[in-house]
């Protein structure tokens, strides 16, 4: 299983540098599952568009893409001194930061790249540019380690809940899988670590919400779990309560794009209603979150900006003919906020946090 799993991860590397290290090589996730196509991004406009149009998506993967994007585009800056170089670098940073307003990893990665440049400012510009590539590589490597740690902690929860001879039922929403990170994913990491620890794909039964309107659960999560050999069922978002009531779901794992200091968590639209259902049916609900997604400057969910997306995603994007009348107003937020009191725990790479979350974040030095 290890070789098969390694081959799978190699096939679906989300973001990497080109062999010449002059561009980003990404999977265009808007084409999945029907077409698996890699595209090369070299300009800041191409990178901005790829993030904005969800060709690369998922908070950790966005952070990695932004870091590499900043390194690649900074490499082309022509400047006489560090001051001029830094001015151009900040312009690139601010431009890339405008692509997605909710994913805090985007800003975290860009700020980290800026700080690395400042730390090298007394050295030659060639050295500064090389340092940016080094920092981006480090961000990617750290993301792999972070996802693996989250997976180990989540796998520990699965082991406690699994009954001998029966698959454990897991529900997830949207895609917080390996396609959303450098490797393993966050919400899917416990499943992949289970395989690494010797479980069979049939020891788990993962139920994927399709995740309207962009269908990340159907197009991406179901795609990658099926390819990894894990028993997978796809359902419409409004079918989750039937599954929970029937006793088929034993635990819920989702990812997130930003966590407020009180534990309120922004994730793909529809996550909050899954948490409400899980609470009603007594099912543990866990957010899987790298500590970089915890925004200590954000007091609660009311302060998390929510991206509004195109009405076409709801009315006509997936259909041969328009499925709603012309002129109808469309409400299409990309995210919702799950209230902290609905969350059983937040699994970070440093440990599992419980309410009161601010105290646990401090205990783990997040």
Which residues make up each language-model segment?
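Positively charged, low-complexity intrinsically disordered leader regions
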Residues: 2-45
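Short beta-strand segments
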Residues: 27, 65, 107-109, 171-175, ...
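Acidic-glycine-rich active-site phosphate/pyrophosphate-binding loop
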Residues: 35-46, 127, 164-168, 221, ...
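Short, hydrophobic/aliphatic alpha-helical segments
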Residues: 39-55, 89, 168-172, 317-327
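Short, glycine-rich nucleotide/cofactor-binding loops
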Residues: 40-44, 175-181, 261-266
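Small-aliphatic-rich amphipathic alpha-helix that forms the alpha element of a beta-alpha
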Residues: 49-56, 62, 273-276
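N-terminal active-site beta-alpha-beta segment that forms phosphate/nucleotide-binding
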Residues: 55-232
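Conserved phosphate- and dinucleotide-binding cores of soluble alpha/beta proteins
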Residues: 203-204, 210-366
């Amino acid at each position: 299983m290890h070789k098969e799993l390694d081959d799978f991860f190699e096939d679906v590397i989300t973001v990497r540098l080109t062999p010449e290290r002059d561009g980003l090589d990404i999977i265009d996730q808007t084409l999945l599952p029907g077409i698996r196509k890699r595209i090369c991004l070299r300009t800041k406009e191409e990178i901005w568009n790829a993030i904005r149009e969800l060709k690369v998506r998922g908070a950790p993967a966005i952070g990695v893409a932004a870091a590499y994007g900043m390194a690649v585009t900074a490499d082309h800056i022509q400047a006489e001194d560090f001051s001029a170089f830094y001015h151009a670098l900040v312009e690139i940073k601010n431009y890339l930061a405008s692509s997605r307003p909710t994913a805090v990893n985007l800003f975290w990665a860009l700020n980290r790249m800026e700080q690395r440049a400042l730390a090298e400012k007394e050295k030659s510009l060639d050295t500064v540019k090389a340092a940016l590539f080094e920092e981006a590589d480090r961000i990617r490597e750290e993301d792999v380690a972070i996802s693996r740690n989250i997976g180990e902690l989540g796998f520990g929860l699965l082991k406690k809940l699994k009954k001998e001879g029966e698959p454990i039922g897991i529900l997830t929403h949207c895609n917080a899988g390996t396609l959303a990170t450098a490797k393993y994913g966050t919400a899917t990491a416990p499943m992949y670590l289970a395989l690494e620890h010797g479980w069979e794909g049939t020891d788990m039964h993962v139920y994927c919400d399709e995740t309207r309107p962009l269908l990340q659960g159907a197009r991406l999560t179901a795609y990658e779990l099926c390819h990894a050999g894990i028993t997978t069922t796809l359902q419409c978002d409004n079918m989750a309560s039937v599954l929970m009531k029937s006793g088929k779901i034993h635990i819920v794992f989702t990812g997130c794009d930003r966590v407020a200091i009180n534990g309120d968590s922004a994730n793909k639209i529809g996550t909050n209603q899954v948490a409400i259902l899980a609470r009603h049916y007594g099912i543990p609900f866990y957010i899987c979150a790298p500590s970089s997604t915890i925004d200590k400057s954000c007091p609660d969910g009311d302060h998390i900006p929510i991206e509004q997306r195109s009405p076409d995603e709801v009315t006509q994007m997936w259909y041969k003919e328009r499925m709603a009348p012309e002129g109808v107003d469309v409400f299409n937020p990309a995210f919702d906020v799950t209230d902290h009191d609905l969350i059983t725990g937040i699994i970070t790479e440093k440990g599992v946090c419980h309410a009161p979350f601010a105290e646990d974040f401090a205990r783990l030095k997040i």
